[in-house]
Amino acid sequence: MEMASAFTLNVRLDNIAIITIDVPDEKMNTLKAEFASQVRAIIKQLRENKELRGVVFISAKPDNFIAGADINMIGNCKTAQEAEALARQGQQLMAEIHALPIPVIAAIHGACLGGGLELALACHGRVCTDDPKTVLGLPEVQLGLLPGSGGTQRLPRLIGVSTALEMILTGKQLRAKQALKLGLVDDVVPHSILLEAAVELVKQDRPSSRPLPVRERILAGPLGRALLFKMVGKKTEHKTQGNYPATERILEVVETGLAQGTSSGYDAEARAFGELAMTPQSQALRSIFFASTDVKKDPGSDAPPAPLNSVGILGGGLMGGGIAYVTACKAGLPVRIKDINPQGINHALKYSWDQLEGKVRRRHLKASERDKQLALISGTTDYRGFAHRDLIIEAVFENLELKQQMVAEVEQNCAAHTIFASNTSSLPIGDIAAHATRPEQVIGLHFFSPVEKMPLVEIIPHAGTSAQTIATTVKLAKKQGKTPIVVRDKAGFYVNRILAPYINEAIRMLTEGERVEHIDAALVKFGFPVGPIQLLDEVGIDTGTKIIPVLEAAYGERFSAPANVVSSILNDDRKGRKNGRGFYLYGQKGRKSKKQVDPAIYPLIGAQGQGRLSAPQVAERCVMLMLNEAVRCVDEQVIRSVRDGDIGAVFGIGFPPFLGGPFRYIDSLGAGEVVAIMQRLATQYGSRFTPCERLVEMSKRGESFWKTTATDLQ
């Protein structure tokens, strides 16, 4: 049976050809290798029709132009040569589009990313809609790749090398007005007139190319270029710590094209694409992409979710304010905040105002849209307006009696169907639900701080939580723009449980004499966004260490913190960034002063600050404990799958994405190697490093957690 075409040609009465992109049975348009023959057949027809005045590419999808190439194509390549051939095929197709003797215009609405933008770049002009859904970018670097269909060569010539490098090296996505300002698109119009605007551009013959800004012209010359690539290379190396080979290859390929011409540039691009596709970093990053896509499709349970029309929040603090913001402004749901203090409500409202006003200032949002979103948030000091809320999120202090009281009050003041979701980070959900009259509607919904930035939420049903409550809470989390994982109601849940031994070990090394900055730098070099000591300062030392006794009580000695260290720090009124002093000292709010390690920390904890461990040794001790605990979590069914475990670690605590998560990383080392390292560390440093039974068994059998493909679980 012949495959339905993703590209359809229609010629209007005014002799302008419209090529409509509509991948059958898919929500998103993605480019597949098999579409090449369809496009070539259309190009042949275009060349044969001598009456044609021009061509417009447009999507039939309601909210995307082309979201990129189908990543499965890369996974199907077994060698670098196969992946290189794939890139060359894409380059050739784009070259054929660009070589058409009549004007070719891309009419862009929605996501125009990766291969989609490369197709648009191959056109002679581009017009896009002013819709917030319209974004343009080359995000391949986030998959450990580079643009392989000419993007590294066409973009620098269109918008200038420094701007193009920023886009390609970061995967940054531009909104319509930014794209217009940079010259990436020729016009921005309302969606209703997109096609006609593109047709008008065709009738102007070829759009006149605007000259590059003076700065970009200087940087394109040999001297400016040498200086630019040296500076950008240095900055990129500092940012990536040498862990992402794609960034180095991007710089190399773009420079080759500018110095030696496009032919050499395309050749270097295809070759680098093929080689990068085979790197373990790209394979790991693609596995994270597939896993997160999979998690987003997971309903959490087999039951249908209940309707969600409005939400209530208890507590207007930092977490409550952040949760209100994502509920109103991302999920689009009316939110009512209850706080015993009017100042708490004002704080929560100001939090959302600050976020939205920042978007208005950056011209990402209209003032009228800001006001519309803010109008969804209201506050009260009692339960007025709570009677018909479908779900209440509790974000009050970590106190069991207080949370149980909140459950009782919600059951008394809200509808019989109302779900109670606790944002606890450490208290068992079963205990919070212990006195509930409707325990099946009590669940944990654990956000991470700052709420608007952290993508993960943990959803924690207790033994009596209903399947519908789980499904409804998962539905809300997705509407809020979060990636939810469902975890078991055990102390620390998943993320805090694997994080605690990692932080504890860092503190232990401090007491042994390692310096704060050495420990943090070692873990940043390993691939974490910040080191464990700085992380504790950012979270708040009082908040971050509160869970340690809970975990020690539940799991024993392996979770114990070094004696008296935490209490000494807290007794010295050190809470971290929030009060200006922790392990580091912070300048006054609003002032741009670098944080500095406080030398007084060493005598305070009885340490010398004269370490002997190398950076890899420091990282090994912290990371191995995290891996061991993650495996225990699978064994105890705290997480439902290793997919959730990898996503939870990467999105929840910044586990290095290029390693693919704890379970991918164990597989890459081999269970046998992990066991050998842990046994060596146990001999040197104590029984907390004893590898768990599951790891030892896997080592004996030569087993791994994942199958070889990026998308399948074993």
From Swiss-Prot:
Q: Where is this site: Important for catalytic activity?
A: E118, E140
The domain of life is Bacteria
Q: One short Pfam family name for this protein?
A: ECH_1
Main location group: cytoplasm
Pathway where this protein functions: Lipid metabolism; fatty acid beta-oxidation
* Record has Transport as a keyword: no
Q: Which GO terms describe its biological process?
A: fatty acid beta-oxidation
One GO term in the molecular function aspect is: enoyl-CoA hydratase activity
A cellular component term (GO) from this record?
Answer: cytoplasm
| Alphabetized InterPro entries for the sequence | 3-OHacyl-CoA_DH_CS, 3-OHacyl-CoA_DH_NAD-bd, 3HC_DH_C, 6-PGluconate_DH-like_C_sf, ClpP/crotonase-like_dom_sf, Enoyl-CoA_hydra/iso, FA_oxidation_alpha_subunit, FadJ
Give its localization: Cytoplasm
Give a short account of what the protein does.
Catalyzes the formation of a hydroxyacyl-CoA by addition of water on enoyl-CoA. Also exhibits 3-hydroxyacyl-CoA epimerase and 3-hydroxyacyl-CoA dehydrogenase activities.
Subunit (UniProt): Heterotetramer of two alpha chains (FadJ) and two beta chains (FadI).
For this protein, the record's PANTHER family field holds: TRIFUNCTIONAL ENZYME SUBUNIT ALPHA, TRIFUNCTIONAL ENZYME SUBUNIT ALPHA, MITOCHONDRIAL
Q: What is this protein called?
A: Fatty acid oxidation complex subunit alpha
Natural source organism: Escherichia coli (strain ATCC 8739 / DSM 1576 / NBRC 3972 / NCIMB 8545 / WDCM 00012 / Crooks)
